[in-house]
A protein has these predicted regions:
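Boundary/entry segment of secreted carbohydrate-active catalytic domains
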Residues: 4-60
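Aromatic-lined substrate-binding rim segments of carbohydrate-active enzymes
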Residues: 41-43, 52-109, 131-165
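Carbohydrate-binding surface patches
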Residues: 349-395, 402
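C-terminal beta-strand-rich structural cap/linker in extracellular carbohydrate-active enzymes
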Residues: 410-436
Length: 436
């Protein structure tokens, strides 16, 4: 049993199972229908350590090149699970449910997802148009309602979560998509009690017209659930909608609202260098998880080769060579690697003295009982010096820097005070407690 009998510094912090954080790390990817061979996709997913992939019925056919078997093979070879969505403009709920059952029976299904950004890709559902340039979103609302009901009425699928559409903040009429379930007296066009989803879904890209430049706390602020966030975040989609200012949840409810991100990321351009992109994406997964996002999917695994525009979002270049983002994430997931289960995470007594607003922490625990305290900085320039104090004298402490590699950069014995110099990336402190 792990014990910490030493001097109490503060209220001990309960850890989160390392696997729970690793399971949150997802990605958007091209597949054979967009010219990316499955074998290369498997190779890239494995290297980075992704645990889930955002997917759906767009581009899916019985004849291929992308079939249900493509996704089953991806799951079998990498262990990833799949969020399964209607994607852009899709309306075929029957196909979504049918193919989702195949994935579920193989253990490959993570969740169902509603339409992708209906403000950009409208739908025609049961003869009614909605979203896009239409004046009403009623068709979008009815489609999402029916998707939810179809999943929850199926005995195989009922326990799988349904994620909302993305961009409900763009609604042109108040059909209530800013709620998971429309509450009483909400004064929406759809009736009170209409249920759309189990999780809110946002596309909170780190760089946004209201926040276009690199800055301190860039990913931390993008994950902010309050009105202080200057990107397309939770508040502007489920608090007060950004387009027509329809009222959604109060802040105290937003703080605990189950939520996911199915698209975020950054492309390389101007002041956003390959190095900064790599740091942003690594910090992003940490900030999202710490601030309540159960799952986060970054756009994009590899740069698109079948469309124009800025194609430098990828962890990989078009020639399949890894950018720094891929290398840094590989190092982080390798350092944290854990495939075991931890029924009840323990608690660690620690404090960070002189902690500025650009320094954040996340306490994890592996299935073998080892604590992994991740402390990261989000400074654009300069450094912060902090001291991590432990309430007990651990047997050994190892410090890892994922921007350098996977091996420890420092090992300490019988040390309960750790000096850190932080700038723009995480340090993983692996703490091996004394056993008795």
């Amino acid at each position: 049993m792990t014990v910490w009998p030493g001097l109490s510094l503060a209220a001990p912090v309960t850890a989160v199972a390392t696997n729970k954080f690793l399971d949150s790390i997802g990605v958007v990817t091209s597949l054979p229908d967009r010219g990316q061979p499955l074998a290369r996709t498997i190779e890239m997913v494995r290297y980075c350590g992704f645990r889930w992939v955002r997917a759906g019925i767009e581009g899916l056919s019985d004849e291929g090149p992308t079939t249900v078997q493509t996704f089953l093979d991806l799951h079998r070879e990498t262990g990833v699970r799949l969020s399964w969505g209607l994607v852009s403009g899709g309306t075929d709920v029957t196909k979504l449910v049918k193919t989702g059952k195949v994935l579920a029976e193989a253990g490959a299904l993570l969740a169902f997802e509603g339409n992708n950004e209906p403000n950009n890709w409208g739908v025609t559902y049961q003869g009614e148009k909605g979203g896009g340039r239409e004046s009403s979103w009623m068709a979008v609302a009815k489609l999402q309602r029916d998707l939810y009901q179809a999943v929850k009425s199926d005995p195989v699928l009922a326990n799988y979560p349904v994620w909302s559409i993305s961009e409900p903040g763009a609604q042109r009429d108040n059909v209530g998509l800013q709620f998971l379930t429309i509450p009483p007296s909400a004064q929406t066009l759809m009736p009170d009690g209409t249920t759309y989803a189990d999780y809110a879904n946002v596309h909170n890209y780190v760089y946004h017209p209201h926040s276009p430049s690199p800055a301190d706390n860039k990913t931390w602020d993008a994950a902010d659930p309050t009105a202080a966030s200057r990107v397309d975040g939770l508040f502007g989609n489920f608090g007060v909608t950004w387009s027509r200012r329809f009222r959604g949840y109060a802040q105290d409810r937003l703080d605990t609202l189950p939520r996911v991100t199915t698209e975020t990321g950054t492309y390389i351009q101007g002041p956003v260098t390959e190095e900064l992109q790599g740091l942003n994406l690594m910090n992003l997964y940490l900030a999202q998880f710490k601030r309540g996002y159960a799952y986060t999917s970054v756009y994009l695994l590899r740069d698109r080769t079948d469309e124009g525009g800025n194609q430098s979002f990828g962890f990989y270049r078009p020639d399949y060579s890894p950018r720094k983002a891929a290398i840094y994430l590989h190092n982080l997931t390798t350092i944290l690697a854990d495939r075991g289960t931890l029924a009840k995470p323990g608690r660690l007594d620690f404090e960070i003295s002189n902690q500025p607003k650009t320094v954040h922490e996340l306490l994890l625990q592996r299935s073998d009982g080892t604590f992994q305290l991740i402390v990261w900085g989000e400074r654009l320039r300069g450094e912060d010096r902090v001291t991590v104090k432990l309430g007990d004298m651990p047997e050994q402490v190892r410090l890892h820097d994922p921007t350098i590699g996977v091996e420890p950069v420092q090992t300490l014995s019988n040390a309960n005070s750790i000096e850190l110099t932080l700038s723009d990336h995480p340090i993983v402190i692996t703490i091996s407690p004394r056993m008795q």
